[in-house]
């Protein structure tokens, strides 16, 4: 079973605020080559191209490719011009400089995690009253399909949250983008990957920063502490971490916040902060209703996942028998796919993590299936840490 979660008593959110958050709208990445990055998600992970912004749509300084699988939407944005040329494009000058600076400092990574809300003005004004650092005020973008309201605030590191209100828009994505309808030519040859939505999005912090960041989510966005574990629960022979899951008032949006803890060697959190050059999004968990099909088809498409040792499943079989828990899925199939299992008295969770998506050991993806289980796989953290430490050893960063 998973370690017990720490659930501090907090003041309840105001009833009027409980249903403000509708979920994750999209995740916005800054990357060196958006077209190639989009191709990765299309061919490796079964996403579809849904929208585009670039030279052909009148955007002369930046290009964005939008891909989607289920209700999971990624925007991948790259600069089209050098920093030296930025002054030639006054409308995009600040954005162009920001993207270049982000890529220089962090490499490819997540810039913005956008939330869909019922009323931007309400959530944004409350955040500002409570001390939010404003990146951009409430603004409206529109086209023939209606209008979208949005505003952006800063969170940890250089990451931001954009609040988006879509009630007045009937288009496929967002004004300023051209919709894409042609299926990728490879899709008819590759197995379909069915994903549902973003389950959670994890942020890594530097030493002793977790509590400050969690306090920020509580104060600025009205989030609460949903679940937590400390270094006694999440440790190996060499390293450890602490984690607190922050959730929106209605528990629709969940943002786990990690920080390193003392250990004999450098942990994966320290490695991330070192290579990312600061705090940022470590991984995005994508929910599926059939993880066996999803992992089977992702592997067939060439997605690389961590390897889980045989001993994990020997121990898990004993634990499941002791608990009297019978999985709906075939245990040997889960084992053959390296899928991790965690459970409590109410249900169970199945999960697996990709290897890092970039050469820098920073961002990766989690595939997750929940069966009446609201935790975050704390029972698997040791196995996950050990698997990542084996990768760290190969990179020479387990020091």
UniProtKB/Swiss-Prot annotation:
It catalyses: 3-(4-hydroxyphenyl)pyruvate + O2 = homogentisate + CO2. Fe cation binds at residues 200, 283, 366. Binds 1 Fe cation per subunit. InterPro entries: 4OHPhenylPyrv_dOase, 4OHPhenylPyrv_dOase_C, 4OHPhenylPyrv_dOase_N, Glyas_Bleomycin-R_OHBP_Dase, Glyas_Fos-R_dOase_dom, VOC. One of its GO terms (molecular function) is 4-hydroxyphenylpyruvate dioxygenase activity. Pathway: Amino-acid degradation; L-phenylalanine degradation; acetoacetate and fumarate from L-phenylalanine: step 3/6. Its cofactor is Fe cation. It comes from the Eukaryota. The keyword Metal-binding applies. The keyword Cell division does not apply. One of its GO terms (biological process) is L-phenylalanine catabolic process. Residues 23-166, 197-355 form the VOC domain. Changing residue 250 to S: In strain: IFM 45817. This is 4-hydroxyphenylpyruvate dioxygenase. It comes from Coccidioides posadasii (strain RMSCC 757 / Silveira). The lineage of its organism: Eukaryota, Fungi, Dikarya, Ascomycota, Pezizomycotina. The gene is TCRP.
């Amino acid at each position: 079973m998973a370690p017990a979660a720490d659930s501090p008593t907090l003041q309840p959110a105001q009833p009027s605020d409980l249903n403000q958050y509708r979920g994750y709208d999209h995740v916005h990445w800054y990357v060196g080559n958006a077209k190639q990055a989009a191709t990765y998600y299309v061919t490796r992970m079964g996403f579809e191209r849904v929208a585009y912004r670039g030279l052909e749509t009148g955007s002369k300084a930046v290009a964005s490719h939008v891909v989607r699988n289920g209700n999971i939407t990624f925007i991948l944005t790259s600069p089209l011009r050098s920093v030296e040329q930025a002054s030639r494009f006054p409308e995009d000058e600040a954005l162009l400089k920001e993207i270049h600076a982000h890529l220089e400092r962090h490499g490819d990574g997540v810039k913005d995690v956008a939330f869909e809300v019922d009323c931007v003005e309400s959530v944004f004004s409350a955040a500002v009253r409570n001390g939010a650092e404003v990146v951009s005020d409430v603004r409206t973008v529109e086209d023939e399909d209606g209008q979208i309201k949005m505003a952006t605030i800063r969170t940890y590191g250089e990451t931001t949250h954009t609040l988006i209100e879509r009630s007045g828009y009937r288009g496929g994505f967002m004004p300023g983008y051209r919709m894409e309808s042609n299926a990728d030519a490879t899709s008819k040859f590759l197995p379909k990957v069915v994903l549902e939505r973003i389950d959670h999005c994890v942020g890594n912090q530097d030493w002793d920063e977790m509590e400050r960041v969690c306090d920020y989510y509580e104060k600025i966005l009205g989030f609460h502490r949903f679940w937590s574990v400390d270094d006694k629960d999440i440790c190996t022979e060499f390293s450890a971490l602490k984690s607190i899951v922050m959730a929106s008032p209605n528990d629709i949006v969940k943002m786990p916040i990690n920080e390193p803890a003392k250990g004999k060697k450098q942990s994966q959190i320290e490695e991330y902060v070192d290579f990312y050059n600061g705090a940022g999004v470590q991984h995005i968990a994508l929910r599926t209703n059939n993880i066996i099909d999803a992992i089977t088809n992702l592997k067939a498409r060439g997605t690389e996942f961590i390897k889980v040792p045989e001993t994990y499943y020997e121990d898990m079989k004993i634990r499941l028998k002791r608990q009297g828990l019978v999985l709906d899925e075939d245990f040997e199939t889960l084992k053959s796919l390296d899928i991790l299992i965690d459970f409590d008295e109410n249900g169970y969770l199945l999960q697996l993590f990709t290897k890092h998506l970039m050469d820098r050991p920073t961002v990766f993806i989690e595939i997750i299936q929940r069966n009446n289980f609201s935790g975050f796989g704390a029972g698997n953290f040791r196995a996950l840490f050990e698997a990542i430490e084996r990768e760290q050893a190969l990179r020479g960063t387990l020091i």
